[in-house]
């Protein structure tokens, strides 16, 4: 399974860039995982619609479904087991995704009830994806219940 984490807009903070690179490096040990900066929502929709095999698209939005770390790990493992070829997690712009993008998504996911800066949400997502893979592999990083 190819896992892609994309975010819309330029990254302004050097600290966010460093954390993004750190977690993408950690995630690279668990499979074909990459990050990408896209200019716009239109670029995301074009990428999703032009793929030979339609990807599973997960949009991050404060109005989305909330999962525990364990539930996210279960979701990722289920995609691996059923042979999902391409899974895209997209962190939107500060104002969120439009209705057409939300309609195209397979899942709209929220990181919680609090509002996060979209650059920070990217880092939280990457950490949660890393945590999920450590849960799947039985690595001691996760110390949940």
Predicted regions and their residues:
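Catalytic-core regions built around general acid/base machinery
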Residues: 23, 75-79, 104
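N-terminal beta1-alpha1 ligand-phosphate binding loop
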Residues: 1-23, 27
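Conserved strand-to-helix beginnings and helix N-cap segments that scaffold or border functional pockets
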Residues: 17-20, 69-73, 102, 122
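Short glycine-rich, acidic/polar surface loops and turns
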Residues: 86-100
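Structured adenosyl-cofactor binding patch, chiefly the S-adenosyl-L-methionine
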Residues: 99-144
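S-adenosyl-L-methionine/SAH cofactor-binding core of RNA-modifying enzymes
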Residues: 28-88
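Short glycine-rich anion-binding loops that position phosphate/pyrophosphate groups of nucleotides
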Residues: 11, 62-65, 93-96
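Conserved RecA-like P-loop NTPase ATPase core
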Residues: 5, 58, 92, 125
């Amino acid at each position: 399974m190819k896992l892609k984490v994309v975010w819309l807009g330029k990254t302004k903070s050097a600290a966010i860039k460093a954390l993004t690179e750190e977690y993408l490096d950690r995630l690279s040990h668990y499979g074909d995982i990459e990050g990408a900066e896209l200019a716009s929502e239109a670029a995301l929709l074009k990428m999703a619609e032009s793929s030979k095999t339609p990807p599973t698209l997960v949009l991050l939005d404060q109005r989305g479904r909330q999962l525990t770390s364990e539930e996210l790990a279960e979701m990722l493992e289920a995609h691996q087991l059923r042979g999902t070829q391409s899974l895209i997690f997209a962190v939107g712009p500060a104002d969120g995704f439009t209705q057409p993008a939300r309609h195209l998504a397979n899942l709209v996911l929220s990181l919680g009830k609090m509002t996060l800066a979209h650059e920070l949400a990217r880092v939280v997502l990457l950490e949660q994806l890393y945590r999920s893979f450590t849960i799947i592999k039985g690595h001691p990083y996760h110390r949940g219940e």
